[in-house]
């Protein structure tokens, strides 16, 4: 996880939605670990480097325009997710596509199928 939030807030959020069992604390990257926050690519480049990931084989799931821009700036494919906590009804999916998302969905169940296509 790469976020512009604090590590404690990220972990609290994961616990609230019962996703904390999927992420170890060392897999949570907060803005204070990098020089520049999103939309700069720093956080995603750090995640890729520290986890020995190949950018071409990595897909980021983002719920904000600024996060999508960070992924694009890092050279990593990104899926826009509109059911996230930052999603507001007045925001158009078009914004996420224009920011560089390869696909936009509001359905958790579609993410696996989208990833398989890329």
Show the residue positions of the predicted features.
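Asp-based, Mg2+/Mn2+-dependent phosphohydrolase catalytic module
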Residues: 6-118
């Amino acid at each position: 996880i790469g976020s512009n939030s604090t590590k404690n807030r990220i972990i609290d959020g994961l616990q609230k939605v019962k996703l904390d069992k999927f992420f170890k604390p060392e897999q949570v990257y907060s803005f204070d670990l990098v020089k520049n926050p999103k939309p700069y690519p720093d956080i995603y480049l750090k995640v890729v480097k520290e986890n020995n990931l190949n950018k071409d084989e990595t897909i980021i799931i983002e719920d904000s325009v600024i996060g999508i821009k960070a992924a694009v700036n890092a050279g990593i494919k990104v899926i826009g997710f509109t059911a996230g906590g930052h999603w507001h009804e007045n925001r158009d999916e078009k914004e996420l596509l224009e920011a560089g998302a390869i696909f936009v969905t509001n359905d958790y169940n579609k993410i696996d199928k989208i990833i398989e296509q890329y």
